[in-house]
Amino acid sequence: VNLLFNLVKQTSSALKETDYDIEIAETHHKHKKDAPSGTALSLGDYAALGRKTSLNKSKILDRTKKLSSRKKGEIGFSVTRGGEIAGEHTVSFIGENDRVDLVHKANNRSIFVKGALDAALFLSKKKSGFYTMNDLLFNK
C-alpha cells in the first residue's frame, strides 16, 4: 500500500486537474466499521498533495445529498463492505479519452503482518531516529 501512496501522488501531479477527475474506490470485509477507511483517506491525501491542495478542500464523500455536477478538483470516494475481503483500493484518474487505474488488492491479512515484520527488521539495523515506510521502500 505504501508504494501505491507514492504512485498516486506522482500520477496526480503528472495528470492535469483540468483533464482528469480522481475517484477512490475501496472494498473491505463486512466487519469493518469506518468508511471510508484510513487507507482510502490517505490515498486521497496523496492525490491532493500531487495537485498541491488539501484533501479537506477537495473530498466528496456523499453525492446523494445535493444534486450538482462534478466540480473541478474534486476527489470522490466510494465504499463497499461485504464478505471477508481483506482490502482493495483503486484510485482512478478519469479523463475524456482514457482512464488510469492504480490498484492494490490484499488477498489476505498476512501481507500486513509481512510489512510490519519487514519494517521491524529494517529498523533493527538502523540507528535511533525517525523513519517512514518510504525509507524502507526506497533506501534499503
Residue spans of the language-model regions?
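C-terminal substrate-binding/catalytic lobe of Rossmann-fold NAD(P)-dependent oxidoreductases
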Residues: 19-140
